[in-house]
Amino acid sequence: MQSPTAQGTNDGVLPARTWPSVLGALTDGRDLAVDDAKWAMDEIMSDNATSAQIAAFGVALKMKGETPEELRGLADSMLGHARKVPVDDDVVDIVGTGGDRSNTVNISTMASLVVAASGIRVVKHGNRAASSKSGGADVLEALGVKINLGPDEVARCVREVGIGFCFAPVFHPALRFAGAPRKEIGIPTVFNVLGPLTNPARPRAGLIGCAFPGLISVVAGVLAQRGNSALVVRGDDGLDELTTSTTSTVHIVADGSVTTRGFDPRDIGIARVSLDELRGGNADVNAAVARRLLAGETGPVRDAVLLNAAAAIAAFRGLGGRTLEDGLSDGLATAAQSIDSGAAGALLGRWAELTSGLASSK
């Protein structure tokens, strides 16, 4: 895959937006302008594209190498077709692309609870497991949270509890038109990385994990173009999180630019562990792990959750000239207090109770 910063020869929109012109540009190695990419996704979201066109588009884009402009056009189209969440953007998302095939516990979901209990509002966007045993939606259900809620109900959860969950099939119903072609071709394409960029609440900040090394800088580029504050991360062991088994690569997105650097958890006092110590099971197993964490259990899972919660807190607050290590150290203290005070466990209970009431009244 070519470098995400490589430039094709197409600096403007295509002379005519048709599938032959779009696919011809991609197979010739030419980049699409934002509006051309948006047109293609609009056609898909409107059920105006055939399965062959959708499959060809995903594969051709993958073979050429996606650019931030293309990914932004696709994501903007998806958001245009999504159901809107009536909250302001002063919220944070903690989400990964999935696809790392590590079968770890649900680190980002647990971190979301910790961050929300610290007083920072969270709107998480996710789905059921695709390549793992337990996705964010699966473990939340196992924890008693009702996930099939609409925009107004999610907004109420954010207002009253400090956290909400946007279940992707509810908020992106038009994406179903791409489902069959994606399943038939059976390889990861750009569709696999759009989730973290299409949160219907449009949060201004985020901790975004990307399992695909060729796309992490592209995702960061989109967030920079939007003016977001974010940390886009990939563990050097392949995790779509900040890992504690080795170092991680971090793209710091701030003020419209991206800075890339490495990070070693030992630099802020977190010991390295084996990846096996972070592995989980099905939704019920991972929910039990989450409950023990919220009850105060220490160990490798707590360290990984605290680290990722700290990163989300740092992304929300901004580094403000501090080093990444300083920002994460401050976030660690906040996250630890969120668990140790009982606030995170209490928040889960309130959230589950509220969503149960909202679901039963629908």
Swiss-Prot record:
One GO term (biological process): L-tryptophan biosynthetic process
UniProt: 5-phospho-alpha-D-ribose 1-diphosphate binding residues: 96, 99-100, 104, 106-109, 124-132, 136
Residues reported in the UniProt entry to bind anthranilate 2: R182
One Pfam entry name: Glycos_trans_3N
GO molecular function, one term: anthranilate phosphoribosyltransferase activity
GO cellular component terms listed in the entry, alphabetical order: cytosol
Subunit note: Homodimer.
Function in brief: Catalyzes the transfer of the phosphoribosyl group of 5-phosphorylribose-1-pyrophosphate (PRPP) to anthranilate to yield N-(5'-phosphoribosyl)-anthranilate (PRA).
Protein name: Anthranilate phosphoribosyltransferase
Native species: Rhodococcus opacus (strain B4)
Record lineage: Bacteria, Bacillati, Actinomycetota, Actinomycetes, Mycobacteriales
